[in-house]
């Protein structure tokens, strides 16, 4: 059976943008009767939400799309927001180094991207790469949704 996708709107105050904002994410229908969806992309600026989280959403007739109600089941994934500080830095090398650590990336532009760190990935390796790049003032990063498992990884 082919997966069914729906748009899910999320409203929140973004610390990155410093304003109230709305972000549209894609969700795979998990249970249509219960309005449960699995988030299928990485939130760019958003709240404590990660790719693959199962969320409950209600359909908004006026907007003609679903609105997030709450997170039903966290995926255990971590979302990391990254700002590139160095203008003349090889972006491909940067992305490949992070991707090599078993992550996924979604780009906003040349200066901002988000990382999905799957639950099975050892975050200690990812964190070491990010911390080294931050120390070199290549990037600055934030962890708006650090899973308990990944928090424990960096404390090993």
Where are the model-predicted features located?
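Short, Lys/Arg- and Gly-enriched loop/turn segments at beta-strand edges
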Residues: 60-72
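Short, structured beta-strand/loop micro-motifs enriched in basic residues and often containing a Trp
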Residues: 31-41
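Short glycine-/aliphatic-rich beta-strand segments at the starts of folded cytosolic domains
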Residues: 72-86, 113
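C-terminal effector modules of nucleic-acid-centric enzymes and ribosome-associated factors
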Residues: 85-156
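Extended boundary segments
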Residues: 1-19
């Amino acid at each position: 059976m082919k997966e069914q996708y729906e748009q899910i709107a999320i409203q929140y105050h973004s610390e990155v943008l410093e304003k109230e904002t709305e972000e549209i994410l894609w969700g795979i229908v998990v249970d249509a009767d219960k309005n449960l969806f699995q988030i299928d992309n990485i939130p760019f600026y958003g709240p404590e939400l990660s790719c693959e989280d199962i969320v409950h959403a209600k359909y908004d007739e006026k907007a003609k799309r679903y609105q997030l109600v709450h997170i039903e089941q966290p995926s255990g994934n971590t979302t990391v927001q990254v700002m590139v500080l160095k203008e003349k830095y090889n972006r491909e090398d940067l992305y490949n180094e992070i991707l090599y650590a078993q992550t996924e990336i979604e780009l906003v532009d040349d200066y901002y991207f988000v990382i999905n760190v799957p639950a099975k990935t050892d975050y200690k390796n990812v964190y070491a790469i990010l911390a080294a790049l931050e120390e070199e003032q290549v990037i600055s990063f934030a962890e708006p949704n650090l899973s308990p498992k990944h928090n424990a990884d960096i404390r090993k």
